[in-house]
Amino acid sequence: MRLTLPVLLSTTALFAGTAHAQQAAAEAEADAPIIVTAARTILPPSALPLTIDVVDKETLDQQIAISGSVTDAIATLTPSFSPTRQKLSGAGETLRGRSPLYAINGIPQSTPLRDGARDGFTIDGFFVDRVELIYGSNALQGIGGTGGIVNQVTVGAPQQEGLSGRLLLQGTADNNFHSDGFGWKAGGLFQYKAGDFDATVGAAYEKRGVFYDGQDRRVGLNLTQGETQDSRATNFFARLGYAVSDTGRIDLIASRFELKGEGDFIALPGNRATGLPTSAVHGTPPGKAAANRTESVALSYTDSSFLGGNFISQIFFNRSRDTFGGEVAPIPTFQDPAIAPVNTLFDQSQNRSRKLGAKFSYERAVPGFEALTAILGFDALWDKTEQRLIATNRVWVPPAEFRSLAPFAQTNLKLFDGLVRVAGGARWENVQIKIDDYHTLASTTFVACSPRLPAGTPCGNSTYGGVAVAGGKPKFDDLLLNGGVIVEPWEGVRAYASYAEGYTAPDVGRIARSVNATGIDIDSYLAIEPIVSNNREIGVEVKRGPIDASAAYFWSSSDKGQLLVPGLGRNFDVQRQRIEIQGIEINLRSETPIDGLKLGIGYAHIDGRYDSNADGKVDTDLDGVNISPDRVNLSATFNRGPLSAIVQTQYFLSRRFQGPARAADDANPLRPLKLGDNDFGGYHVTDASIRYQTGFGSLRFSVQNLFDKFYIDYSSDTRLPTDNLAFFAGRGRTFTLSWDYSF
């Protein structure tokens, strides 16, 4: 889709938007400092050479009421974030062209050793107080932050003595009020404070109906990766706290989240040639429905005046179990003639991961040199992940153990009474990955018979068998650096330049399970070396009077990046290639002469390329599985008295993917790979929401896809160009009515 100048001008006159999270709470308490816990410092964001957004509670609840999840809310507000797939799996969803680290109170939810892409659905938004976004590669939270950090901060301790809490009731319906499209949600949070002790307990339950597209057809199901539609989700949450002194506090926080598919529908193939999307019909899919379960417990002790500084400590345990659904047609990857005749064997997989970790940091102004603030810290993480085939109890991805020990230091020097700040730091990562000897699935060595094979080449069922792989303990250690300069010539106006390095482990599971050659030794297997990426950034921010504006140019590279490419069936494999990404993000929001009305606009342009032939030079565009489209965000918000409202439009701009393989495919009259079909056509979607505060709670009415626009989602439009079971339309007009009461 291309935006003409008249369309942009006329739309801008009506709407405006911002990618930066609204700061309603901050505006209500303008003098209260904003502390971003994900940045590992109590210094305000303006003192850091980073692009940071904080999505406050009101904005988050508003967006969740429209779209249904924290992930959708963040993707809507952030132009450089990929549009979500509206599925349980977030595979291919990126921030600035790389995978972000999802965290809850700093506890990593991502499982990079075998990325099940379920990390966006590990807690219900009902229990999230705010979301902190740090953009670009960094190692502030350790492994996983190559695209940035999405830290979900849960509800805080109660501030008033006695009993308080919150209740939520919500109903959702599609445009034509189909009986199978109805959904509902109920949540309750109860808090009690008695002197130094406080307790919080809560539960949330959500039943989602089937989604319908803009042409009143059921949105297709991805049985394997999982769905949020036709599902039930439960979340239990608890927090216990005790103030040991005026400045010291102990907190114990626990959460259990589970989302399960109902298993009432099966997929109906679409037709890419005619533009007919995948749909769904009543039926019972085989095996267990796709599901996601996450359990976490964290114990922390903080003291804001420990030896004159701020001390933070945390130990945590996190366990997840991601069940991938089965397909009606047996999956080729799981076939093994030693178990059952080929094309008759049913199976499905499940990721199992558990983490144990600890974090410590101490921050204070240096005695005798108060302009210099220093932070010393140490992080430790143990992660064990495997992927099993649960119908036949086979191992698909062998258990992989990850161990990280990381001391770090950060400094921030205030010069010329705050006119200039110089910040910098280092983190030493010492990592070990352990994988025992294992045997790959039988299908990894399968060769299909074809007239094109050289004479005498083994093929057919005799080639099933897999290979034995020698395990090992590859190690990695590196010093990850960051630094930057901030200049603030006037209050509310600042410019900054920064450099930061981040790292993550590649998807070791995808790599390990795909080995199909003998003689492989994990200790010397290049493909499992960690991904080290850097982020260079130049930015300007203006927050003065009615204006809230920012602009940032960023570029990053990684010599051994990670690229998802289609494999056997609908599975994706990993390739390690050099990757370079650059982009620009601009946001503007302004108050208007109309009291309570704010307008703004957000724009992001991102280019990403990789080295397709290992010559050290990037030559091919990253496709839609690996990078987001360019986008314009527009919205208008209104807040006055008991009434608040928003109208927002997201324009996802068309994109053509170029490279040698695409050029060769286009030059072939038969177009065997159909790579041109992966070009993105673009689309736009408008949402709206209105809220009124009554004397007994607030009423909110929200509409997703206000004009019932029919479109093919970005992920479907840019991958698997011959797969008619993975051609999904986006959700059509959807109504949500909610009642929210705090006491």
Predicted features and spans:
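Transmembrane beta-barrel wall of Gram-negative outer-membrane proteins
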Residues: 178-213, 217-264, 293-295, 368, ...
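Membrane-embedded beta-barrel scaffold of Gram-negative outer-membrane proteins
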Residues: 300-304, 310-329, 486-488, 494-513, ...
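Gram-negative outer-membrane beta-barrel transporters
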Residues: 168, 374, 422, 546-559, ...
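Extracytoplasmic beta-strand/coil segments of soluble accessory domains associated
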Residues: 37, 41, 71-111, 135
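C-terminal beta-signal and adjacent terminal beta-strands/loops
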Residues: 503, 593, 651-667, 691-743
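Short acidic/polar hinge/loop motifs at secondary-structure boundaries
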Residues: 107-137, 188
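A beta-strand signature from Gram-negative outer-membrane beta-barrel systems
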Residues: 123-168, 742
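Flexible loop and strand-edge segments within Gram-negative outer membrane beta-barrel domains
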Residues: 227-233, 247-304, 320-330, 335-338, ...
